[in-house]
A protein has these predicted regions:
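Serine/threonine-biased, Pro/acidic-interspersed low-complexity stretches characteristic
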Residues: 1-78, 85-220, 227-304
Length: 304
């Protein structure tokens, strides 16, 4: 067994998560926020409805009236852009976003986004410079001009060919004690959802780290079986990949490759070439610079 396989081999395909929520999140029900509008502790909820032309988001939040929010729709493994909408929060905290549905098939990610730095001064001042006063489970970091800023985000992942309604997902964070350590660990759980494998993983990687998912087929190349995402605030992440229909045995590979485009704090923790990485998941990259990367491998033998 290769050394970098050690952490991942104990995790196999289990159950069908459609029967219940993942341990990494809970489905957010529509409800009236507990905190008043304009509170630094932001609450947001809602649902997504899909028809042949439109992806519609109907939601509620305690963001102040007039706050601008955006809806972005992305299709996995596609470079399509421009599928967005923008609206303002109403006096009662409600909002509606309508995004044109792309005319291609595939799993889609819908994100609702609020950035204090994009608001008028009155609203921006409520949440501090770069959103540093924001609180709650919907707060994420992003980097701009080498500075870490804060935003509010909630979303949903769905296949429009299989789903017509889905809730926005409320995250539940559980940051490990060794979060951000260069001795990286990844604990994945693979669940089969119809024609997809959904990979949920816990790790101690820093928020914003780019992780990739591919499928390694023995003895041959196969395209179109990949996904990528950014690590969440507690080191967790999830990705989805189509289940191969012809292969009997293959390996799901999760990788993290440090590079010059990482956030500043990640460069300090891991090194731009991964030179500070350690632990059983470290693998030498195939380059002349001697770079290091993280790789977790999960052998899969599909169920009938």
């Amino acid at each position: 067994m290769a050394q970098h396989e050690a952490e991942a081999r104990a995790y196999t395909v289990t159950g069908n998560p459609n029967q219940g929520a993942s341990s990494l999140d809970e489905r957010a029900a529509n409800h009236t926020p507990v905190h008043q509008q304009g509170s630094s502790y932001v609450e947001i909820s809602g649902g997504v409805s899909i028809d042949k032309n439109t992806v519609k988001v109907t939601g509620h939040s305690n963001l102040p009236a007039g706050a601008r929010i955006k809806g972005n729709l992305a299709v996995k493994n596609s470079l399509l852009t421009g599928y967005t909408d923008e609206t303002t929060i109403q006096k009662d905290g409600s909002f509606v976003l309508r995004v044109q549905r792309p005319g291609i098939q595939g799993s889609m990610d819908l994100t609702v986004l609020f950035r204090p730095d994009d608001q008028d001064n009155e609203i921006r001042n409520l949440y501090g410079s770069g959103g540093n006063k924001l609180e709650g489970p919907y707060v994420y970091q992003y980097e701009e001009n080498k500075q870490l800023l804060h935003e509010v985000r909630i979303g949903a992942e769905f296949d429009p060919e299989q789903e017509r309604n889905t809730p926005l997902v409320k995250p539940v964070w559980n940051k490990p004690k060794d979060y951000g350590s260069p001795q990286v660990w990844i604990k994945p759980d693979v669940k089969q959802e119809g024609n997809y494998y959904h990979v949920y993983a816990r790790s101690n990687l820093l928020e914003g780290s780019d992780v990739k998912l591919t499928i390694d087929f023995p003895g041959r190349w196969q395209f179109g079986y990949d996904d990528q995402t950014k690590v969440m605030p507690d080191g967790s992440f999830s990705m989805r990949v189509k289940k191969p229909s012809l292969a009997n045995r293959y390996t799901i590979v999760i990788s993290f490759e440090p590079n010059e485009d990482m956030w500043t704090n990640a460069k300090q923790a891991y090194g731009t070439q991964g030179e500070r990485l350690s632990g059983p998941l470290v693998k030498s990259a195939d380059d002349k610079e001697g770079s290091k990367q993280i790789e977790a491998r999960i052998p899969i033998q599909p169920k009938s």
